[in-house]
Amino acid sequence: MIIYTTEVEDINSFYTLESLKEVYGIIWMLVPILTLVLGITIGVLVIVWLEREISAGIQQRIGPEYAGPLGLLQALADGTKLLFKENILPSRGNTRLFSIGPAIAVISILLSFSVIPFSSRLILADLNIGIFLWIAISSIAPVGLLMSGYGSNNKYSFLGGLRAAAQSISYEIPLTLCVLSISLLSNSSSTIDIVEAQSKYGYWGWNLWRQPIGFIVFLISSLAECERLPFDLPEAEEELVAGYQTEYSGIKFGLFYVASYLNLLLSSLFVTVLYLGGWNISIPYVFAPELFEINKINGIIGTTIGIFITLAKTYLFLFISIATRWTLPRLRMDQLLNLGWKFLLPISLGNLLLTTSFQLLSL
């Protein structure tokens, strides 16, 4: 059998073309993921800078001002410092669990960002069960914290890990019941559909007004899930040194630091999506019909406006969370568990029953 040179060249060119298609396909899959990671990183840096500036203002002192203009690069400088510090492993601890714990905490939170809609056409994964996927993934993070506490072979770390697991379980259930109420109101578990269901009457269509009890419970549960004051018992400095982070140093300690702010940003975004109308403009149609038409703009301009509105609402909630941290004292462990099991759980369950009753009556 004789194969001519031209035929061999055609076969090679076809093979090369198919390989290029696969490479381009992989690249186009990675572009939105890397863009989202870059945006999340910038968002975390902004939150760290905001927290330092707001806390400095509340305490009447000067915040960061030397690293970059207005101290904007201070968080980047701190991250670089942690990156080059020595990574110390506990001699009598379980090094595998000790090393895996921070990674589980960060990855579980990062995966949850995939179902966040920043605009009507800007979402990484529009799933029918998007909101419950977030609940399922976020429940993995406490496992990483418990592994970190156990793997450290330190009594303070282990107690901090146990506290983190108990706190997460206590407040995950009221949070899930509030999300279920929103899903019933919107007749969908997709984050896109939930935002679209709030888009008819400006801010009067927000779930904040239809679910005020659920909003308050969700707000408190979100702060508890983020382990922010007054719910920072897993890492209470006066009692447990630094909780499950006691034995960590270098980049692994930095991962826990990043995970806490990632969780805060994620919770703020879900408050915006579930209760504050997402990317929709807040002006009611009866007041300014021409502004209400912004919701219908497509393309790059519409996407940019949607991102700006979403982030504006998100950082409003972030400001409330940061101000709360520097205003309220820490709860005791028994008070924290009583609040979750004896108050928030019955209230969220009653809210769900009321929502279900109204939905059945409206059929």
From Swiss-Prot:
GO CC, any one term: chloroplast thylakoid membrane
GO MF: NADH dehydrogenase activity; oxidoreductase activity, acting on NAD(P)H, quinone or similar compound as acceptor; quinone binding
Listed InterPro entries: NADH_UbQ_OxRdtase_su1/FPO (IPR001694), NADH_UbQ_OxRdtase_su1_CS (IPR018086)
Similarity comment: family membership: Belongs to the complex I subunit 1 family.
Subunit structure: NDH is composed of at least 16 different subunits, 5 of which are encoded in the nucleus.
Job of this protein: NDH shuttles electrons from NAD(P)H:plastoquinone, via FMN and iron-sulfur (Fe-S) centers, to quinones in the photosynthetic chain and possibly in a chloroplast respiratory chain. The immediate electron acceptor for the enzyme in this species is believed to be plastoquinone. Couples the redox reaction to proton translocation, and thus conserves the redox energy in a proton gradient.
Protein name: NAD(P)H-quinone oxidoreductase subunit 1, chloroplastic
